[in-house]
Amino acid sequence: MLIRNILEESVQKFGEVKAVKWLNRKEVLEKSYSEMMKNVISTRKGLLAEGFEGKHIALIGTSSVEWIESYLGIITGCTTAVPLDAALPCEELIDLINRSDSEALFLSPKHRPYLEAFLANCPKLQKVWMLQKEVEDLPSGVYSICLLYTSDAADDLIGV
């Protein structure tokens, strides 16, 4: 039985059962098999529509529901998943993307600083998708405050 068959059977039998749970700050979020399958199908169809049938697609990211859905979208379609260790340095990831003949990449926001290097050094790479929406660095209700120092007439430092 193929993974695609197992996944589709799980959705039929357990559609509303929670397939994954994860912690987002202090809130426990969850997704059912049916909810996940919608994103898996969207990923699969999107890859085919963009001409990636039969191609190798790399994934670099930490454990997340988006990573799982992307991975399942790749392996249940006509594409080959190349999951790469997110802890590897940029140079090694570039080497693996090239050696695997990956033509597209799913990338976590944590690895966005590597994006320019990937695009410059991976000639087969045609498309990159970010795995998660970027979250603001500051939680809501927190403000940046800056204290500048200058000197007064007596050359004493004063905060302004």
Predicted regions and their residues:
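Conserved AMP-binding/adenylate-forming
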Residues: 29, 44-88
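Structural motif detector for alpha-helix initiation sites
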Residues: 3, 32-33, 90, 145-147
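Conserved small/polar residues in nucleotide/adenosyl-binding loops
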Residues: 149-154
